[in-house]
A protein has these predicted regions:
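Active-site-proximal mixed secondary-structure blocks
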Residues: 1-43, 49-116
Length: 118
């Protein structure tokens, strides 16, 4: 049996729900970045994967804000060209989920949630 979808006929939300429901298992990454002023940002990502080992290439699906401005992670990566991908364990799953909340730019989510930056 074959099932097909006309992605252009689906809303953005419907496409998202379809993708996250069919591409499994999907590990969750807690991506940390630092802005130009040295402030840490942390955000969860389920859209990431290894594309190549040689050369090492990692894909990270960074979305923009609704007004198309960069979210903190995208902004920081563009400014510093540095980010860290942390694989989320069950022990920090709740904190990771809270990191996905909308914090004002410049707020250190790790500090807010008592997570340690190494």
């Amino acid at each position: 049996m074959t099932v097909s979808f006309d992605f252009m006929a689906l809303s953005e939300r419907e496409r998202y729900k379809l993708m996250i429901g069919t591409i499994i298992p999907r590990p969750i990454a807690l991506v940390t970045t630092v802005d130009e002023d040295g402030r840490i940002n942390a955000a969860p990502f389920s859209f990431f994967n290894c594309l190549s080992a040689d050369p090492p290439i990692l894909a990270l699906g960074v979305e923009n804000n609704p007004d198309m401005s960069f979210k903190d992670t995208g902004h920081n990566i563009r400014m510093t060209e540095v980010f860290t991908v942390n694989i989320v364990s069950f022990a920090i799953a709740e904190a990771m989920h809270i990191c996905g909340s909308k914090y004002p730019r410049g707020v250190d989510e790790l500090k807010e949630l008592s997570l340690i930056h190494i």
